[in-house]
Curated annotation (Swiss-Prot):
This is Porphobilinogen deaminase. One of its GO terms (molecular function) is hydroxymethylbilane synthase activity. Monomer. GO terms for biological process: protoporphyrinogen IX biosynthetic process. Pathway: Porphyrin-containing compound metabolism; protoporphyrin-IX biosynthesis; coproporphyrinogen-III from 5-aminolevulinate: step 2/4. GO terms for cellular component: cytoplasm. Its EC number is 2.5.1.61. It catalyses: 4 porphobilinogen + H2O = hydroxymethylbilane + 4 NH4(+). Its cofactor is dipyrromethane. The gene is hemC. Pfam families: Porphobil_deam, Porphobil_deamC. The keyword Transferase applies. It comes from Bacillus cereus (strain AH820).
């Protein structure tokens, strides 16, 4: 019986996601056993500055990918939105399980909705994507950076001078806290989700055919297709955590991919947005990127990167 070593970050959410996925594999009843290896990433250690300031790409995955390449582990369970657009040679996303709710969750101290927040209220987020889109809707708000895992951020909302914070609905759902803490879900038209938000990425070595066969049982074709379109768009624009960039795809009634893509200025005063429909994930992602480039996306990205230096 083969033992599969599964790499995971140490946070409660990461371990919850990893153990959930292992349970899906165990339910297949095939002759494998599993062991979780906890790995500390750079993103877990650097908590005193925003992700964009420390070069956001791959902050939560590099050490785990190193463990894959050196065969310390056989596969890793990541949040898809943490994955860089390009993976190291020899590694691949071997499986995308079914995506859960991709929306952002708005959590306010007083129970007020986003629209009801008092003028000048303090909004906590560590995401340039969220801050740009929410400042575009409410320029009167103040954004204050907030870092840490879910529990830490919820505690900071209670104890510090934040009026509200934004978290991914998916993480709260996986922890079983969504009904308890969420004031409202932000509609995708107000705040386009991050590329891959709500989805998991199961990363493994390209040459591990045995494991790839096992992972194929859990793969969700719809999630694979939609996330592929989003990631092609992200790759073409070379967007990471340093840029307000968003991309969310769904499957239409006619089985086409519909991708809404966005690039913004840091302060939300400019938001470029395009929706592209097509059948091929790569073509849809490239078309969305090309249309935004024509609108001036590259200039916004350049300005955002300069602002981070």
């Amino acid at each position: 019986m083969r033992k599969i070593i599964v790499g995971s970050r140490k946070s409660k959410l990461a371990l919850t996601q990893t153990n959930w996925f292992i349970d899906q594999l165990k339910a297949l009843g095939l002759p494998y056993e599993f062991e979780v290896k906890e790995i500390v990433t750079k993103g877990d250690v650097i908590l005193d500055v925003t992700l964009s300031k420390v070069g956001g790409k791959g902050l939560f995955v590099k050490e785990i990918e190193h463990a894959l390449l050196t065969k310390e582990i056989d596969m890793a369970v990541h949040s898809m939105k943490d994955m860089p657009a390009v993976l190291p040679e020899g590694l691949m996303i071997g499986c995308t399980p079914k995506r859960v709710d991709p929306r952002d969750a708005f959590i306010s101290k007083s129970g007020a909705s986003f629209k009801e927040l008092a003028e000048g209220a303090i909004l906590g987020t560590s995401s340039l994507r969220r801050s740009a889109q929410l400042l575009a809707a409410r320029p009167d708000l103040q954004v204050k950076w907030i870092r840490g895992n879910i529990d830490t951020r919820l505690r900071k909302l209670k104890e510090e001078d934040y009026d509200a914070i934004i978290l991914a609905t998916a993480g709260l759902q996986r922890m079983g806290w969504d009904n308890e803490v969420i004031t409202e879900h932000l509609d995708e038209t107000l705040c386009v989700p991050a590329v891959g938000q709500g989805a998991l990425a199961i990363e493994c070595r390209e040459d591990d055919k045995d494991l790839l066969q096992l992972l194929a049982h859990i793969n969700d074709a719809v999630t694979e297709k939609t996330v592929a379109a989003e990631r092609v768009f992200l790759h073409k624009l070379e967007g990471g955590c340093q840029v307000p960039i968003a991309g969310y795809a769904t499957i239409t009634e006619n089985d086409a991919i519909e991708l809404t893509a966005l690039v913004g200025s840091m302060d939300g005063s400019v938001l470029l947005k395009e929706t592209v429909v097509g059948t091929d994930p790569e073509k849809v992602g490239l078309e969305a990127a090309d249309r935004l480039i024509k609108q001036g996306a590259k200039e916004l990205i350049l300005a955002a990167n300069k602002g981070q230096q």
